[in-house]
Amino acid sequence: MNRFITSILVVFISMSGWLQGADTGSISGILGMRDFQSRFADRYNPISNSYSYSAWRQALLTGTINAGCLFGAMLSSPFTERIGKKYSICFFSGVYIIAELLLVTAVPSWIQVLVGKILAGVGIGALSVLSPGYQSEVAPPQIRGAVVATYQIFSTGAALVAACINMGTHKLRKTASWRTSFGINMLWGILLMVGVLFLPESPRYLIYKGRDEEALRIMCNMAELSPESEIIQTNFNTIKSDIEIEMAGGKARWIEIFGKDIRYRTCLGFLVMLFRELIGNNYYFYYATQVFKGTGMTDIFLPAVILGAINFGTTFGALYTIDNLGRRNPLIFGAAFQSICFFIYAAVGDRKLIYKNGTSDHRAGSVMIVFSCLFLFSYCCSWGPMGWVIVGETFPIRYRSKCASVATSGNWLGNFMISFFTPFINNAIGFKLGYIYACINLFSSFMIFFLAKETKGLTLEEVNDLYMSNIKPWESYKYVREIESHRIHFSKEEEKREREKSKGIRGQEEEFIENADEDNNDSSSSSGSVVSAVKPRRSAVSNDRFSEDSHPTYI
């Protein structure tokens, strides 16, 4: 398996994000379908011949999936430690498939829909921990951030596709309108479960389990280098020594992730993922219909498609920001800009969108849509993908699965709070809710400045060293620059030594060949002399390299 194919497969694991986006992106449209409402809504208006949901029923149908995600995120750790990330991803993909099957066959009980959404949440929550963690362990550090960011790209892409599917199926007769959406979601789960079987296991997990030869082979395939390569040997020995040091303390217990050396990172990961949701990105998708109606638009499915397209298109900006602007700056300035967007959105919505006589100001609605789109652009280039990157690369291997579970549970806790409580709060204060989100974004900006350290381009082992040091978060970029400078210098020195040693070997070969010709030896014996003379030299060169005390070059 060459490097390109393996890289494609590592990106393919972001299909886990596709499952999340497909499920969350389809439910709002499905709830608005006439046939679905007639079967599962709890309110009927005979005058208008229409169905609707009570606040409690709507909160349960939209919010309980996040409760399932919270449970699934915590459940992923014991599975990872027992069977590894690869087969854990396969297992929880199966859980998601079963959940979608329950949803497809949910007639006429709304309780079955509720159970199906909770079970789907368990699968999605576990996959949201496993997939970014797997990608962080397998991807090279130079592109690790971009690879993990593809999780968010897949998620937003799936939400757009789901909105388009809903728009195309909502006019179908009877149950086909919503069963089609659930059925297609089930196909995505099958695709992931089958595809993951072709992925290599994480080398760090294999070394952790004592399967060194298998780990070394996978590392060689990923880098397209031989096992004797200094880069491979250095990386392998670094990972192995770090694992041995970490495992010297025995199997990590849950209480240890709140111990002195690790609780800072545990809390940081949890807070980043919690505020990733509390800053209000999903609010726009839940209440886009109201805003778009203010502009005169009546199609309830079109707003989801428009916002989904913006959400998906702008997420590609994260591929640039993550590995060029780093981790801290996009989060700090992104949240500050989002605070401004929400403040203007709330002010216009509260004062201008709806008049007392019930009419709406189309210009006010247009302004709100513009700032909704600006918010989504900023979010998709910063907080959207960056949370998964931080969770994937911040924790040491001994605690990684447990810390990632706790951190990701913050994401689903925040999502649950938004989806469950927003209907009640919005009914009470309307667009003033935007002021609250503006304050949360501003707080998030300061939180990142004082807590998160810059980790752009660092290996997972260097990230661990950084957080174990006393370097202040706002000074951590200096550490990153020093590491990058040292790495570039080492690479140039290594290339220079390789050229010099290669010249020396060629000179020896020519000398031996000339001596062999003078002695009138046959071609076969001459060849044997050259090989026997060169091989020890290559071995000596290799040994000399590993004796040097120099900073490693990482793949």
Swiss-Prot record:
GO biological process, one term: carbohydrate transport
Biased composition regions of type Low complexity, renumbered to the chain: 522-534
Keywords: Glycoprotein, Membrane, Repeat, Sugar transport, Transmembrane, Transmembrane helix, Transport
Biased composition (Acidic residues): 510-521
Region (Disordered): 492-555
Topological domain ranges for the Extracellular compartment: 31-58, 109-112, 166-179, 286-301, 350-363, 426-432
Transmembrane portions of the chain: 10-30, 59-79, 88-108, 113-133, 145-165, 180-200, 267-285, 302-322, 329-349, 364-384, 405-425, 433-453
Topological domains annotated Cytoplasmic: 1-9, 80-87, 134-144, 201-266, 323-328, 385-404, 454-555
Membrane-related topology note: Multi-pass membrane protein
Gene3D superfamilies: MFS general substrate transporter like domains
Sites where a glycan is attached: N357
Basic and acidic residues bias: start-end ranges: 492-509, 545-555
GO CC, one annotated term: plasma membrane
PANTHER family, per database record: HIGH-AFFINITY GLUCONATE TRANSPORTER GHT3-RELATED (PTHR48022:SF90), PLASTIDIC GLUCOSE TRANSPORTER 4 (PTHR48022)
Function of the molecule: High-affinity gluconate transporter.
Name used for this protein in its record: High-affinity gluconate transporter ght3
Source lineage: Eukaryota, Fungi, Dikarya, Ascomycota, Taphrinomycotina
